[in-house]
C-alpha cells in the first residue's frame, strides 16, 4: 500500500539509481510516460491563455518531472500578460531539472523563480516520479493527484491567504508581502505500482471536476492492457480530462467543486452582503480584480453555481513497465522535449527582452548607488550613456506614472516619490537601441 505524506517543511526526496516498482507482486524496472494538454479561457484564445506546463523525462526513462504554472489573470488590468511569466517559469524549471538532477523540487522552483525576471505572477505545482516514489511542491491552487485502480491515493490541498487569494510567486509584485518558494507545501508518496497515474494540473481542472471523476476517467482508459502503448494512454487521459473540465466550465448548473466552495464561503459572509476575500498576501493590491488566477466572480460561474471558466492545463504521468513499453516511452519523451522547445521558441522575444532588462537593471543599480551613496558605479559605461528621461521629465511625473515607467523596465516600484525619481533618473538608454515600454512611452508623451 502506498504511503502519502503532505507537509509544509520540505526535505530532499530520494531518487537516483535504478527505478523499480511492483507489478502483480513482481519487481519490474520502471519508466515514466508523460503528456501535457491545455486549453485557454475562451476569452483568451488570441493570447494563448495564462497557463503553462512542461514534462521532462530522463534519458534512461526512469524519472520524470511534471509541472504546471497558472498565470494570475488580475495582472492584465495592469497591462501585464502573466502567461509570459508562467511560460518562462516552466521553461526555466525544465532546463533546471534537465541539468541539475540532484536538486529538490523546492530548489528547482527557487531557481526558476530567480530566472523569471519579468512582470507577472503564477501559482505552480511540480512533481517528480522515480520508481515507486513521487514527491512534489505546491504554491497556491495548482495541485497534484495520484490515482490507482479508481482510488485517489494522494490529493494536495490548495494554499490560500483568504478566499480566492491563493499563494503565488511573482517578480516585482505590485504590493504586499510576496510569497516565495520557501512558502510552498511539499508532498511525497512511496509504494507506487506500475499503471499508477500522477496528475499535475491548474485549478481549471480541480475547480470543475471532482477527484472521484478524475479517477473514473483514468480507470476507463484501461492502462493494464497488453499493447504497451503508454504514450497513447497518457495522451488519451489528458484529452479526456481536458474535455470533461471544458464541458463543466461551460455548464452553469452542474455540481462542481468550485460551486460547493462558493456555497460554503457565502455561508460565512454577512447575510445579504457581498463576497469578501481576505486582505493578506501578494494580491492585497489586486483585491478589486478578484485576487485569483482569473476573474473568479459570479459572472464566471453562473451566479455561484455550475462550473468556472478558466484556463485548463493537465499533465499526466504514468508509471510503466520499461521492458514492455520502452519504444512507446521513448516516443512519449520525444513529445515532452518537443513541447519544451516549442515553448522556448515562442518565448524567445520575451526572454531576450528579459535579458536586456537584467543588464539594464545592473547598470541602473550601479548608477543609483553612486547617486545616493556617492560610491563608484558598478559599470563604468553606465554613466557615459544618455539618460532615458531628462531630470525635468522625471520631476514632472506623479507617483503613478513613475511606478508605471519603472515597472515597464522591470525595476522596483516601492518607496517614496523622491526615491522613485532618483531610480528612474538613473536609467540610461539601451546602448543597442532596443525598444522598451519606457522608451516607447517617452516617445508617445513627447508627441
Language-model-detected regions and their locations in the chain:
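Basic helix-extension-helix modules of the SAP/HeH family
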Residues: 379-443
